Amino acid sequence: MLIYKYIYGPVNSWRLGRSLGIDPISSKRKACTFDCIYCQVGKAKSCSLKRRVFVPTEKLIKELSSIPKLNIDYITFSGTGEPTLAKNLGSMIKEIRKFRKEKIAVLTNATLLGRKDVQRELKHADLVEAKLDAPSNDLLQIINKPHKSISVKKIVDSIKMFKKDFKGKLALQVMFTKDNIAYAEEIAKIIKSIKPDEVHLNTPTRPCGIKPASKEEIDKITHHFKSLRVVSVYDKRKRKKTKPISRKETLRRRGKA
């Protein structure tokens, strides 16, 4: 039986369909620029902006090459931290392109999108989903607990800068909790200034100790985003059946399989 260290899923994603996860961090401790209150991976020992190689590209490619034939829609970079902290993220994407035909997505908190090296690497992805949970620095501290150098303005400016040259699909996710749902209109105003291709309205549905917003609460605030293409975690769409190749690794990164 093969043991997978860097790959998890595939899972049924309400955003991406059948999604096979790639974790370019794959460390026992979360490595992130945020320490979000709703993160199912757990708490970060500290937040860092330093990029480094966590998983050698050749090891990831060897593991990906060994998986059985799967019917998937996306290969998605996400997992035990912020994917753009992986210094070899670009080489991973390019090597995967050589032998896989599926679309590639990267889920990022957007804190490093202002960096030219990160922009160059992400241009090879089909979809980049950035995150914006707070319209103010006070809320950013409460919800995302970022590295001390990060501000809402820096995040928004970084996303706008990235969008200028990105040829793929840019989505923005908002994770709504009791702390920010009253600020939906303010968040929507900022997102409209960014003009993403799609907005994903989310709430913590995985085990994390934070109570999710109800379907009624999410439906109630959706009108603030009416000029944008919106997808909600509560949208009724037929989910495609999937079975993870490694239940253990999937549970470790997602809290559920």
Predicted regions and their residues:
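Short, basic/glycine-rich phosphate-binding loops at helix/coil junctions
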Residues: 38-44, 71-74, 134-139, 170
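Glycine/small-residue-rich loop that forms an oxyanion/phosphate-binding "nest" at active or ligand-binding sites
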Residues: 72, 77-79, 96, 105
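Short hydrophobic-acidic sequence motifs that mark active-site Asp/Glu residues
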Residues: 19-21, 74, 129, 171
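Auxiliary Fe-S-binding modules of radical SAM enzymes
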Residues: 2-15, 26, 62, 68, ...
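Conserved AdoMet/S-adenosylmethionine-binding subsite of the radical SAM
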Residues: 84-213
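Conserved alpha-helical substructure of the radical SAM core
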Residues: 42-77
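A secondary-structure boundary/capping signal
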Residues: 23, 79-80, 108-109
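Canonical Radical SAM [4Fe-4S] cluster-binding loop centered on the CxxxCxxC motif
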Residues: 15-55
